[in-house]
Amino acid sequence: CLGNHDTFPIDQLAPPSIFSRFLMKYLNETWKLDKNALKTLAYGGYYTQLIQPKWRIVAINSLYYDNHNKLIKETIDIANQFKWLNDTLLEAKKNNEVVYFIGHIAPKMGEATDYFTKNFKEIMKEYNDTIKYQFWGHEHKDRFFVYQDAHNNTYSFGFVGGSLVSDHKYPNFRVYKYDPKTKDILDFYHYRVNLTETIKTNKISIDQSYNASHTYG
């Protein structure tokens, strides 16, 4: 999915226009998506695609909800993304599909706008039985979070998987282990690029920093 470092200047992306279409055209040529996914990607930077029968990826363009983006108005549904999201999840629910949700700037984190946080949380509540997991970036930190209602009932769960950017830490990434039948996440393994060893040996040195089942139990 599209991140805030994918544009220049950073964080800036206009609503559908000749400038945004230029970027989306490049992504169209780079990402291997189906025809319908490429169509919505070209228009608004968001898409959905089946990975296999009954297992769907839904990806949003969170740059439209970045409060550092000076080219957008916060209180409107830019590129009809929320309408598309609701329609997509409704169809997935009717078809009994499992949805993995991906985005860059998570609601109520980083630079997410209040408009995004409010509307997204309502959608998560509505489709909590369809969206199995959320996967986010942007924070440059390894973390996870839960969404709870006023009665402390959990209605959604999300992962933030670190960053390859070496800002005050080693570049890091994550590999997930999942059940192919249920699509449950069974474990994940977090890796880092050891820059100290890489510089010493002039070879990329990757080691496992931890795995979830051993660390969290």
Label for each model-derived stretch:
Residues 1-3, 100-104, 127-145, 158-162:
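Active-site neighborhood of phospho(di)ester-bond hydrolases with catalytic His/Asp-centered motifs
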Residues 8, 16-91, 95, 141-217:
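Metal-dependent phosphoesterase/phosphodiesterase active-site architecture
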Residues 64-83, 90-136:
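Active-site-proximal segments of metal-dependent phosphoesterases and phosphodiesterases across multiple
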